[in-house]
């Protein structure tokens, strides 16, 4: 099977962990250990989040003069290289030398008139208490929103329209290469109006929506949204909580899921499952082999007879 694996933001940096290279390296190793056993039987494409990493780079860059600070699109490209390098090396340490791996910088087309630019919603960077967030807001002009009990920076999150590097990804897959691409949702890019020239924008594309687009453009058989939750649940955190095992896209669209966490994953999974009656899975990275077999997590396919529970 051709499988696209979207690693959640916790894959390289869990909430509360220090944003050090050693921490991210350790978590990359854990992700590689989960994914490597699939390589013998499947074509693998890996995407990943980059919110904490790109936010940290932006904060570091804010120490420079305004004209010296790098924009978010450049920072996103930096994180694609950094995270891809760690994942690629850790996978290479587990797989035979003959198994090719490649990390690909990925530009993704967006619409400059996307309404997302008028209402920033995408969390990036570390968490702050309110006093610290207020101080940075005053100094840097950043927009902050509450994330649980803490505060995080938010930026625009336009909808991805097209992946510019989709042909190189296909070429690499034809050679049985494990491809790491579209990190952090890819680099937001648009054509300059009236000209055949690409421009990049200060924004962050939702990694789940981009992963779904990538899976559709690659005609993948399975899209896996690997997260820190074992399943999609109804009434999360309540006594009435129920874990969904199997569902059709229409079963899930009748429910409401948190916009900042499970919501985009469910939306992307349902959109993919509707395209050609394909299968999507949402679950824990540790259960990834069970997700491929359809035994663990939440499996989404239009052919199921009814909603099923764990």
UniProtKB/Swiss-Prot annotation:
InterPro entries: AceGlu_kinase-like_sf (IPR036393), Asp/Glu/Uridylate_kinase (IPR001048), Carb_kinase (IPR003964). GO terms for cellular component: cytosol. GO terms for molecular function: ATP binding; carbamate kinase activity. It holds the Pfam family AA_kinase. It is found in: Cytoplasm. Its EC number is 2.7.2.2. GO terms for biological process: arginine deiminase pathway. SUPFAM superfamilies: Carbamate kinase-like. It catalyses: hydrogencarbonate + NH4(+) + ATP = carbamoyl phosphate + ADP + H2O + H(+). It is an enzyme of class 2 (transferase). Keywords: Arginine metabolism, ATP-binding, Cytoplasm, Kinase, Nucleotide-binding, Transferase. Pathway: Amino-acid degradation; L-arginine degradation via ADI pathway. Belongs to the carbamate kinase family. PANTHER family: CARBAMATE KINASE, CARBAMATE KINASE-RELATED. This is Carbamate kinase. The lineage of its organism: Bacteria, Pseudomonadati, Pseudomonadota, Alphaproteobacteria, Hyphomicrobiales.
